[in-house]
């Protein structure tokens, strides 16, 4: 289990690196999906299964729609892949910054494999993520409404920004 969590953390970092190296949106979405699956798997291994499932469903339901729009509007005849020199240069630079951060920060505790699970005492224990669901819907109604309106406003702002010369989303390719 320890090596599995280490593998998930490595996949999470590599997925973030795949997005941050700035390839075409066609390839950047693959890195985001990899990072999302690894992060939700990491939460799942810690025992927070419901929150992991909700985060994954929200990600697939919401964020991939934004990437469909960005891929449709990008319409590059020659998209930049991960093998292009500029993208490889960004990736090498980010790995260099990561290595320098580990060297300057020290390796104390980095190689100490061990995972403490949440609520592993038995069947009679109340899971923290399940009791948190009631708090989401009872105390968090106002925040959900504010977040929903914020996301709706963000959708309209992004659609207005990518509209381009009052022609809408349909462009001549």
Curated annotation (Swiss-Prot):
It catalyses: a ubiquinone + NADH + 5 H(+)(in) = a ubiquinol + NAD(+) + 4 H(+)(out). Keywords: Electron transport, Membrane, Mitochondrion, NAD, Respiratory chain, Translocase, Transmembrane, Transmembrane helix, Transport, Ubiquinone. It is a multi-pass membrane protein. GO terms for molecular function: NADH dehydrogenase (ubiquinone) activity. Belongs to the complex I subunit 6 family. Its EC number is 7.1.1.2. The chain crosses the membrane at residues 1-21, 27-47, 48-68, 91-111, 141-161. It is found in: Mitochondrion membrane. It comes from the Eukaryota. GO terms for cellular component: mitochondrial membrane. Core subunit of the mitochondrial membrane respiratory chain NADH dehydrogenase (Complex I) that is believed to belong to the minimal assembly required for catalysis. Complex I functions in the transfer of electrons from NADH to the respiratory chain. The immediate electron acceptor for the enzyme is believed to be ubiquinone. This is NADH-ubiquinone oxidoreductase chain 6. Its main location: mitochondrion. It holds the Pfam family Oxidored_q3.
């Amino acid at each position: 289990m320890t090596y599995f969590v280490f593998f998930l953390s490595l996949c999470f970092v590599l997925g973030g690196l795949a997005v941050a190296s700035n390839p075409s949106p066609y390839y950047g979405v693959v890195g985001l999906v990899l990072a999302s699956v690894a992060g939700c798997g990491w939460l799942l291994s810690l025992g927070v299964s419901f929150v992991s499932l909700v985060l994954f469903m929200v990600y697939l339901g919401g964020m991939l729609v934004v990437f469909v729009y960005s891929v449709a509007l990008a319409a590059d005849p020659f998209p930049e892949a991960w093998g292009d020199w500029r993208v490889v240069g960004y990736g090498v630079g980010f790995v260099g910054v990561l290595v320098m951060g580990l060297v300057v920060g020290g390796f104390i505790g980095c190689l100490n494999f061990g995972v403490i699970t949440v609520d592993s005492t038995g069947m009679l224990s109340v899971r923290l993520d399940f009791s948190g669901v009631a708090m989401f819907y009872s105390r968090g109604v106002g925040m959900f409404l504010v977040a929903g309106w914020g996301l709706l406003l963000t959708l309209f702002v992004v659609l207005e920004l990518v509209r381009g010369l009052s022609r809408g989303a349909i462009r001549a390719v």
